[in-house]
From Swiss-Prot:
The keyword DNA repair does not apply. Coiled coil: none annotated. Residues 162-165 are annotated as: Required for interaction with Crp at class II promoters. It is an enzyme of class 2 (transferase). The modification ADP-ribosylarginine is found at R265. This is DNA-directed RNA polymerase subunit alpha. GO terms for cellular component: cytoplasm; cytosol; cytosolic DNA-directed RNA polymerase complex; membrane; transcription elongation factor complex. Acetylated on Lys-297 and Lys-298 in the presence of glucose. PatZ controls acetylation of Lys-298 but not of Lys-297. DNA-dependent RNA polymerase (RNAP) catalyzes the transcription of DNA into RNA using the four ribonucleoside triphosphates as substrates. This subunit plays an important role in subunit assembly since its dimerization is the first step in the sequential assembly of subunits to form the holoenzyme. Part of the processive rRNA transcription and antitermination complex (rrnTAC). The complex forms an RNA-chaperone ring around the RNA exit tunnel of RNAP. It supports rapid transcription and antitermination of rRNA operons, cotranscriptional rRNA folding, and annealing of distal rRNA regions to allow correct ribosome biogenesis. Residues 1-235 are annotated as: Alpha N-terminal domain (alpha-NTD). GO terms for molecular function: DNA binding; DNA-directed RNA polymerase activity; protein dimerization activity.
């Protein structure tokens, strides 16, 4: 049945060609003209930059203080060892960070299979070479930190933030969290009945083995869909600004005059005049206070100095004083 000319075609055929356990081709068709590049480019960017995964971030090698050194009995220099560790493919279940250990001695290659780990960790490519020992008496021991993350985080961005707490000998590694190693897409012509102007999207990708290519495509599509949800309904969902209700009086005015820590003589004179709060006091003038029995110029000067230190003065006018909270007492 012929659909409306305003309706968009939806892809109805998805073919997955599993070239190997880490290499697959995904075909999606038919797509309206132009949508092949639109979807292909979006998925490619997400697969390269936004897929979560696990990567080596720090390494401690016994007897090594910095990455620009060598280790006796080891064919590779430390920089090359770090580069090999960067390519380690690790799958971690239920944790964001794990510590792996490696201890090896004697002539021969040191591979990922020599790494000791618990049941939550899986080394996907145990044959991955880390270095070579060239002497029967040679040995190498290291602690490897693996963390969960997203995208690519170079070591240089973490150096300054961790410099104060990072001990000497702990080497930082560029963290490549993305499990997708290579991705490319191609848009070919597709046909539905009499229409020949349609697109067919072919995505070819390789992973490091920690994620199935089909699952990677599914996750990327989910991320894209979640990001686009906000555009489906463009109603203004911003919450109205809640204006903070300003207090009617400065809190200091509601405090008792005892908080001013006046001398006993001055404090007793104020209480005799029913001046219990700082708000009561600042409304009095100098003339009014001098009329208070036993309160002389020395006490008046003390009161003025104490008020001035708090940004207050005598003779202030306070509208609606006293507040209900005080008037009810």
């Amino acid at each position: 049945m012929q659909g409306s000319v305003t309706e968009f075609l939806k892809p109805r055929l998805v073919d997955i060609e599993q070239v190997s356990s880490t290499h697959a081709k995904v075909t999606l068709e038919p797509l309206e003209r132009g949508f092949g590049h639109t979807l292909g480019n979006a998925l490619r960017r997400i697969l390269l930059s936004s897929m979560p995964g696990c990567a080596v971030t720090e390494v401690e090698i016994d007897g090594v203080l910095h990455e620009y050194s060598t280790k006796e009995g080891v064919q590779e220099d430390i920089l090359e060892i770090l580069l090999n560790l960067k390519g380690l493919a690790v799958r971690v279940q239920g944790k964001d960070e794990v510590i792996l250990t490696l201890n090896k001695s004697g002539i021969g290659p040191v591979t990922a299979a020599d790494i000791t780990h618990d049941g939550d960790v899986e080394i996907v490519k145990p044959q991955h070479v880390i270095c070579h020992l060239t002497d029967e008496n040679a040995s190498i021991s290291m602690r490897i930190k693996v963390q969960r993350g997203r995208g690519y985080v170079p070591a240089s961005t973490r150096i300054h933030s961790e410099e104060d707490e990072r001990p000497i000998g702990r080497l930082l590694v560029d963290a490549c969290y993305s499990p997708v190693e290579r991705i490319a897409y191609n848009v070919e012509a597709a046909r539905v009945e009499q229409r020949t102007d349609l697109d067919k999207l072919v995505i070819e990708m390789e992973t490091n083995g920690t994620i199935d290519p089909e699952e990677a495509i599914r996750r990327a599509a989910t991320i894209l869909a979640e990001q686009l949800e906000a555009f489906v309904d463009l109603r203004d969902v911003r919450q109205p600004e809640v204006k903070e209700e300003k207090p009617e009086f400065d809190p200091i005015l509601l405090r008792p005059v005892d908080d001013l820590e006046l001398t006993v003589r001055s404090a007793n004179c104020l209480k005799a005049e029913a001046i219990h709060y700082i708000g009561d006091l600042v409304q009095r003038t100098e003339v009014e206070l001098l009329k208070t029995p036993n309160l002389g110029k020395k006490s008046l000067t003390e009161i003025k100095d104490v008020l001035a230190s708090r940004g207050l003065s005598l003779g202030m006018r306070l509208e609606n004083w006293p507040p209900a909270s005080i008037a009810d007492e």
